């Protein structure tokens, strides 16, 4: 069984998906992390200076994507992400990598290279929670349950700002908001697999909801679809 959760950055997909996976005993696929790992791998080649893969080189990026060794492993109550055996969970959450991932994700060849990798996750375990931008529309169009989680750009910027503050990192709210709006525009207007709800997805707006409310509504919907 596959449950897809799509939506823009900062809407709360990661928290919701982890809660659903834990509650239902399903595996978790964070497709955004896969694109971030691809971007990180490209940035690492640039740092090493050998066979550097540029972020505007679609086919070099696609070739790199096909060779990625990515694992999602639960550790200490969180899902840790490994690239070639190295835990890169922290590295892929930086703003530089996030921006690079959004640029990498616009290329059809890269999306095609990563499509099979993502679909293979559905073959593991009794079920899969798939977190992303096009899980319900492209990667798993026949998923039994589809959710689309959204929130206003302002609310998502507030959450990101508070998250940075909690980590002792200075953040500029206006800059964060501008970056979110720019990323939204790229994601919603790319030619291949643009960010949009599947026709048969439940729309959840988390702007005014607590995460507990979002989880409760999602679980109730899943139960209604699988009863």
From Swiss-Prot:
Q: What class of enzyme is it?
A: transferase
Main localization of the protein?
A: cytoplasm
Q: State the EC number(s).
A: 2.7.4.25
Gene3D superfamilies associated with the record: P-loop containing nucleotide triphosphate hydrolases (3.40.50.300)
A biological process from GO:
nucleobase-containing small molecule interconversion
KW ATP-binding (keyword) present: yes
What is the name of this protein? Cytidylate kinase
- The species this protein belongs to is Actinobacillus succinogenes (strain ATCC 55618 / DSM 22257 / CCUG 43843 / 130Z)
